[in-house]
Amino acid sequence: MKYLLSYTPEVREALDRNRPVVALESTIISHGMPYPENLRTAREVEEIVRSQGAVPATIAVIGGRCKVGLTDEELELLATSPEAVKVSLRDLPVVLARKSLGATTVATTATIAAAAGIEVFVTGGIGGVHRKSPGDPAQMWDVSADLTVLGRTDITVVCAGAKSVLDIGATLEVLETLGVTVLGYRTDRFPGFYTRDTGFGVDARVDTPEEAAAVIHARQQTMLPGGVLVVNPVPEEHAMDPDEVERHIADALKAMAAEGVTGKAVTPYLLARLKEVTSGRALQTNIALVKHNALVGAQIAVALKAGK
């Protein structure tokens, strides 16, 4: 993997000097938000990371290379190009071989970041176990590769929980089976992306970046496979009402089943539907939580380097 990596000078220098670096995914740019909000948010998130003393490394696949850190022109390309494809692990060899423009999912970003020696990765929300479509009890479980990658990759992922469109209980069961440590940042509850509490708990609560870093460092010392998931609830002023979100998701799932949407198109479809039916409020919540995660993730990355 390492010989396929290309770095921006800023990221390469930071890694060489053992400075804190924060990985960022690119699917949120190409598939998670519309233009121009996607480009503006990507730029603002990178600046938030820098403001805390860390270096941002947005990851994507461009020209047959795994890019660790993007130029502003590359960010704009991902934000505007209809040719950008969503790259999970199974897609990575194809996208590399064809030299396509690829936006990396949580699973692929985590894999590339770990190969580059980056310890902390910030995203909006992780994938997980999808809910079954109404009226189809025989439907197979759709389980995101994000979970299996977290179970085998030494990386810390900071997010606002699992996306609300997922089966949260089943997702947490898989994380437990894989041995992933789930930390709640200033919370005892597992958040659900748009909402602050899904009704499920976390493995442990941490209230400072230093406390989170201590747990991460202890896990690294154990040499256990897999990583740490730090869940950081969306700020209260931007959180959505859980009952409203559930109602919209139920309606969206019915529409999705009627339209035959499957596979990697599911999450973008559901997020777009939520944006539409909430008159853009879901998008604003998404932007707010990503920025909040960038702030906390950068602080944890700095604390992790300082504590070693």
Swiss-Prot record:
Chain positions recorded as substrate binding sites: K86, V106, S144, A145, D146
Signal peptide limits: none
Keywords, comma-separated and alphabetical: Glycosidase, Hydrolase, Lyase, Manganese, Metal-binding
Top-level taxon of origin: Bacteria
Active site: E25 (proton donor), K163 (nucleophile)
Cofactor binding, note field: Binds 1 Mn(2+) ion per subunit.
GO cellular component annotations of the record: cytoplasm
Protein name, entry field: Pseudouridine-5'-phosphate glycosidase
Annotated organism of origin: Symbiobacterium thermophilum (strain DSM 24528 / JCM 14929 / IAM 14863 / T)
Gene this protein is translated from: psuG
